[in-house]
């Protein structure tokens, strides 16, 4: 099992490292640059260059069944689920086969509404409650991935 992190704008990198170390699990922080190497023997920084979604493409090409992913990117979450991985977003929302379709539809609707100017606000600020929800959810994801592997 490996934890894949869509790291460019991830606000919970430190929490991922804590959980990954506790479970002694390899963590790959994938980005397009600008991040420092995570301070953990279990973590590796993967820098991909090129087109806009190069980090997403790298994760989708390397992730597999039983792996874990952390991303707020709904299309990437969909690709990872289709590969058999288990995931969570930085606010603690579990990505599942049951909710990814509705999440994609909502994302597409909101994109259309923003383009027409009907919606101008974005996501609410990330706070301590989100961080706590992520830690709880990440532990559940790790247990589910370990059970799937066994």
From Swiss-Prot:
<dbReference type="Pfam" id="PF02639">
    <property type="entry name" value="DUF188"/>
</dbReference>
<dbReference type="InterPro" id="IPR003791">
    <property type="entry name" value="UPF0178"/>
</dbReference>
<comment type="similarity">
    <text>Belongs to the UPF0178 family.</text>
</comment>
<protein>
    <recommendedName>
        <fullName>UPF0178 protein Mmar10_1466</fullName>
    </recommendedName>
</protein>
